[in-house]
């Protein structure tokens, strides 16, 4: 029995990146032997064990053979005779098929992963890559993380991904798996690379048709020098990741904010009146299909509906600002206003030439919200108030607080 460190921990160490969890592969053992050493079995589909002291995952070396459609149809062989090289061959990309012998720090790299790391190439290991459609989304997710380091996908890997899409392999993916890859990509520094990669291999229209529909829809060049709405969406996603690193909730809201532009009648192009209202239905549809968590869905709908109001905040009456806060449920969920402000700033800055622009509307919205939030029912003279009168008096007090919080000379945001 011998164990090797494999996968992401080895890859990230070679890239000089912070390593995540350590995963190990065990050669020459069977489940009974692992249990006798105190390892706890946790794998459902194949033999995986937790180390009795460290809690790290140790998986028996295995091979996988396709015997059905989709990503679930595999026969797993975890016999003790399976070699390390055979186990590494079943993995997706060469950079993930590097093992380290911790006893002497020797790298085992049978498929050229070290060279691909040096060349900044994401390359599949074997034709078996095409047997698992989830790997198309994994490739896109890896690009969201690795593109800032200069990585690109090998041409032959892109060709295989396109063929997988053309063969209908991605139609078997369940919504939960799509959401898992999408949400993880939103936690990385360049989520636009996820969208760009999927679109390059014609997969975006299969798994995220609402987003794919944005590409080719023009915006007014005076306000959007990038013109294409899909490109604007990519820019917004990357700015959101910069403003709120690792925040998938904000990332998803930013992703959905302009979905309504895909539904604008062509006769009104490149203008998009009412796109915030039109975007509510596709945002709801996308969220429900992918079974997105409720808090993600709610913030996405808020961002879709309210982003133009935040852009033109200086033009809104005090009572209109209060109504905006109420629609956001901002007095019970105060965190939503700061989140909305970040999404709106990402939208404003997600345009060619505006990436570093100042966005005072966001700070001002938070300031108005804080002023209104500081007023509560206990502050009222309730001696002569009854029933709904209390709520009405509280609303008026909060509107006065908003009025007293000051104004600023902001933009109108009308043409966003």
UniProtKB/Swiss-Prot annotation:
Q: Name one GO biological process term.
A: RNA repair
What reaction does this enzyme carry out catalytically? a tRNA precursor + 2 CTP + ATP = a tRNA with a 3' CCA end + 3 diphosphate; a tRNA with a 3' CCA end + 2 CTP + ATP = a tRNA with a 3' CCACCA end + 3 diphosphate
Positions contributing to ATP binding: 8, 11, 91, 138, 141
Q: Name one GO molecular function term.
A: phosphatase activity
Q: Where is the HD domain?
A: 229-331
* Comment on bound cofactor: Magnesium is required for nucleotidyltransferase activity.
Q: What is its EC number?
A: 2.7.7.72, 3.1.3.-, 3.1.4.-
Summary of subunit composition and partner proteins: Monomer. Can also form homodimers and oligomers.
The UniProt family comment states:
Belongs to the tRNA nucleotidyltransferase/poly(A) polymerase family. Bacterial CCA-adding enzyme type 1 subfamily.
Its function, per the record, reads: Catalyzes the addition and repair of the essential 3'-terminal CCA sequence in tRNAs without using a nucleic acid template. Adds these three nucleotides in the order of C, C, and A to the tRNA nucleotide-73, using CTP and ATP as substrates and producing inorganic pyrophosphate. tRNA 3'-terminal CCA addition is required both for tRNA processing and repair. Also involved in tRNA surveillance by mediating tandem CCA addition to generate a CCACCA at the 3' terminus of unstable tRNAs. While stable tRNAs receive only 3'-terminal CCA, unstable tRNAs are marked with CCACCA and rapidly degraded.
Which protein are we looking at? Multifunctional CCA protein
């Amino acid at each position: 029995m011998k164990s090797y460190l494999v996968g992401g921990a080895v890859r990230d160490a070679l890239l000089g990146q912070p390593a995540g969890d350590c995963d190990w592969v065990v050669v020459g053992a069977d489940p009974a032997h692992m249990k006798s050493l105190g390892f706890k079995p946790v794998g459902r589909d194949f033999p995986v064990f937790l180390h009795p002291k460290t809690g790290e995952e140790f998986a028996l070396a295995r091979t996988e053979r396709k015997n059905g459609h989709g990503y679930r149809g595999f026969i797993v062989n975890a016999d003790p005779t399976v070699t390390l090289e055979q186990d590494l061959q079943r993995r997706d990309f060469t950079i993930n098929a590097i093992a380290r012998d911790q006893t002497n720090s020797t790298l085992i790299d049978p498929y050229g992963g070290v060279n691909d790391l040096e060349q900044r190439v994401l390359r599949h290991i074997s034709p078996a890559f095409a047997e698992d459609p989830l790997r198309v989304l994994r490739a896109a997710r890896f690009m969201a993380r690795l593109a800032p380091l200069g990585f690109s996908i090998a041409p032959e890997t892109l060709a295989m991904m396109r063929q997988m899409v053309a063969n209908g392999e991605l139609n078997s993916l369940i919504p939960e798996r799509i959401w898992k890859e999408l949400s993880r990509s939103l936690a990385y520094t360049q989520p636009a690379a996820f969208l760009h990669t999927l679109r390059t291999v014609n997969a975006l229209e299969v798994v995220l048709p609402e987003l794919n529909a944005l590409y080719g829809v023009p915006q007014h060049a005076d306000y959007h020098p990038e013109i294409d709405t899909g490109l604007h969406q990519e820019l917004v996603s990357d700015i959101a990741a910069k403003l709120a690193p690792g925040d998938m909730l904000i990332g998803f809201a930013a992703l959905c904010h302009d979905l309504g532009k895909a539904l604008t009648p062509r006769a009104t192009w490149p203008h998009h009146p009412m796109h915030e209202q039109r975007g509510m239905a596709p945002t709801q549809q996308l969220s429900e299909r992918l079974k997105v968590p409720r808090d993600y869905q709610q913030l996405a709908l808020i961002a879709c509906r309210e982003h133009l109001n935040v852009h033109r905040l200086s033009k809104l009456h005090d009572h209109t600002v209060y109504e905006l806060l109420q629609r956001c449920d901002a007095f019970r969920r105060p965190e939503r206003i700061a989140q909305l402000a970040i999404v709106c700033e990402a939208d404003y800055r997600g345009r060619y030439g505006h990436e570093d622009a100042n966005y005072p509307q966001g700070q001002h919205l938070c300031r108005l919200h804080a002023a209104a939030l500081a007023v509560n029912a206990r502050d009222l003279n309730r001696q002569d108030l009854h029933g709904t009168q209390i709520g009405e008096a509280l609303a008026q007090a909060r509107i006065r607080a908003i009025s007293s919080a000051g104004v600023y000379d902001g933009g109108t945001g009308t043409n966003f």
